[in-house]
Amino acid sequence: MPRSCCSRSGALLLALLLQASMEVRGWCLESSQCQDLTTESNLLECIRACKPDLSAETPVFPGNGDEQPLTENPRKYVMGHFRWDRFGRRNSSSGSAHQKREDVAAGEDRGLLPEGGPEPRGDGAGPGPREGKRSYSMEHFRWGKPVGKKRRPVKVYPNGAEDESAEAFPLEFKRELTGQRPRAGDGPDGPADDGAGPRADLEHSLLVAAEKKDEGPYRMEHFRWGSPPKDKRYGGFMTSEKSQTPLVTLFKNAIIKNAYKKGQ
């Protein structure tokens, strides 16, 4: 009696499952496992055969399709095609955007490496491609250069021999040499050679020029505005005293005439 009740309940359950499967697919009734349902073992085998197919089918929900529950977590949706992707590669549904960025970065790193150079080793001993890359410094801007490397002004003298002589001889020694100037034709042991005279004159002129340079302020005589001629000063308006004499005489005569008229 209990066995017959169990078989009846099993047959009822199988009938419900088969009815549900017939709405989706009716191949369970045609299978060999569901042909003989007289025994409990055959009934269980038929249920096991039809159960995975029923669970794999998409359920049909009544009503509007917009009100159906979501099949996946809403946080898994990531707009990977935008730049402000915040969830990262793990939470994104498709990692194509991240893969694309990594491919671009890898291509840039390959372009930085020289052709035919040694490839980085896989054991981790060699430095990565980004470690060997130099940091970007804005050297083409004024504020990109370091503070310590300032350019010093280079002093340029018009006559190199004059500067050498000024450094070689101190001021007291120069004055002693100018007081004891040797003659052009005589040397310390007697008459000098033909080239000794011009050489002595050159040294004496250099010493005199250096002494003048040390005594007074530096004047830029090699420029036009260093010492302009007197007749060119003030645009040529104020000329010499001789040229100013007729103008002064004219002013004096005018003043005298005005005073004479007022006295009358």
Curated annotation (Swiss-Prot):
Annotated signal peptide: 1-26
Species per Swiss-Prot/TrEMBL record: Macaca nemestrina
Gene (UniProt): POMC
Species classification: Eukaryota, Metazoa, Chordata, Craniata, Vertebrata
A GO CC annotation given for this chain: extracellular space
Protein's UniProt keywords contain Cell membrane: no
Family listed: Belongs to the POMC family.
Database matches in InterPro entries: Mcrtin_ACTH_cent, Melanocortin_N, Opioid_neuropept, PMOC, POMC-derived_peptides
Name of the protein in question: Pro-opiomelanocortin
Subcellular location: Secreted
Region feature (Disordered): 88-204, 219-238
Family annotation (Pfam families): ACTH_domain (PF00976), NPP (PF08384), Op_neuropeptide (PF08035)
Keywords for the protein's UniProt record, in alphabetical order: Acetylation, Amidation, Cleavage on pair of basic residues, Endorphin, Glycoprotein, Hormone, Phosphoprotein, Secreted, Signal
Single GO term (MF): G protein-coupled receptor binding
Tissue expression remark: ACTH and MSH are produced by the pituitary gland.
Post-translational modification: Specific enzymatic cleavages at paired basic residues yield the different active peptides.
